Amino acid sequence: MPRLALLFALFFAPLAAAASENGIVAIASRYDVVQSVDKIEAAAKARGLTIFARIDHSGEAKKAGLDMRPTQLLVLGNPKGGTPLMQAKPSLAIDLPLKILVWQDAGGKVWAGYNDAAYLKRRHGLSDEQAKPLGAVGGLIEAALK
């Protein structure tokens, strides 16, 4: 059994690394951008997270007379959890609160993207324990968009 687990890990590790090579993990959504952000926002609030901002990039572009495919950014977090991390690693404040970007690509597909916890761990020199809560955003998105 341990050999099977090792084989499984060795096979899938490169796939996980490739998915977040640039630090961004993208999850496909079957909903449009507004519905996706609504669902993610509701799931975040249900988990007790604070919504700091919801930025409609495409809406603001339209106000400026520019065209942009639907794109929204949700800024969310938990000050009780994030503040101690930023106290320990002040550079982490550039990436906190957490951000979820939801956009429609050129083919009409909608994606929800976030910074990979492993990327943030490397970027800021976090311990496994410090990085662990940052990885929960993926599960939040997947649960919201199922």
Q: Language-model segments: which ranges?
A:
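Soluble non-cytosolic domains of exported or imported proteins
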Residues: 30-35, 52, 128-135
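Beta-strand/loop substructures that line and gate deep hydrophobic ligand-binding cavities in soluble
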Residues: 100-127
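C-terminal partner/receptor-binding element of secreted or periplasmic proteins
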Residues: 117-146
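Compact, glycine-rich, soluble single-domain proteins
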Residues: 33, 41, 45, 49-98, ...
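Terminal, regulation- and interaction-focused segments at domain boundaries
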Residues: 18-48, 143
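Bacterial N-terminal signal peptides
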Residues: 5-14
